[in-house]
Swiss-Prot record:
This is Large ribosomal subunit protein uL13. It comes from Bacillus subtilis (strain 168). GO terms for cellular component: cytosolic large ribosomal subunit; ribosome. Keywords: Ribonucleoprotein, Ribosomal protein. The lineage of its organism: Bacteria, Bacillati, Bacillota, Bacilli, Bacillales. It comes from the Bacteria. Gene3D superfamilies: Ribosomal protein L13.
Length: 145
């Protein structure tokens, strides 16, 4: 009887992928990128091993939101001081911090814990179409849908 081969750190081959966020919807892009970071697009996916690829997202400032989310969606953070609850609308986030907006959406879709933090480190988000990872020879990745 043959057993299912399990991936381990020495057998994983990681690729570098470039995803263009221009005109894409935030949630649809984020869920696909989270699956790539986890390695679910590979036949060698193993839940307890980080089998995912590196992802570079460009044109983060051109991400789209549907409906009235630009004005109604609010991002909260706390300074850890009394009365330190801060809030920003999605429009302010997209204008001033588009990288953070994408990172927060993708981070929420990854596993919580040390494996999820390790997967999140393989994500690179940039405003504009330039990125400093040309030496890794990234492949352009076309999203489904």
């Amino acid at each position: 009887m043959r057993t299912t081969p399990m991936a381990n750190a020495s057998t994983i081959e990681r690729k570098w992928l470039v995803v263009d966020a221009a005109g894409k919807t935030l949630g649809r892009l984020s869920s696909e990128v989270a699956a790539i970071l986890r390695g679910k697009h590979k036949p060698t996916y193993t839940p307890h091993v980080d089998t995912g690829d590196h992802v570079i997202i460009i044109n983060a400032e051109k991400i789209e939101l549907t409906g009235k989310k630009l004005t109604d969606k609010i991002y909260y953070r706390h300074t850890q001081h009394p009365g330190g609850l801060k809030s920003r609308t999605a429009l302010e986030m997209r204008t001033n911090y588009p990288e953070k907006m994408l990172e927060l959406a993708i981070k929420g879709m990854l596993p919580k814990g040390s494996l999820g933090r390790q997967m999140f480190k393989k994500l690179n988000v940039y405003r504009g179409s330039e990125h400093p990872h040309e030496a890794q020879k990234p492949e352009v990745y076309e999203l489904r849908g």
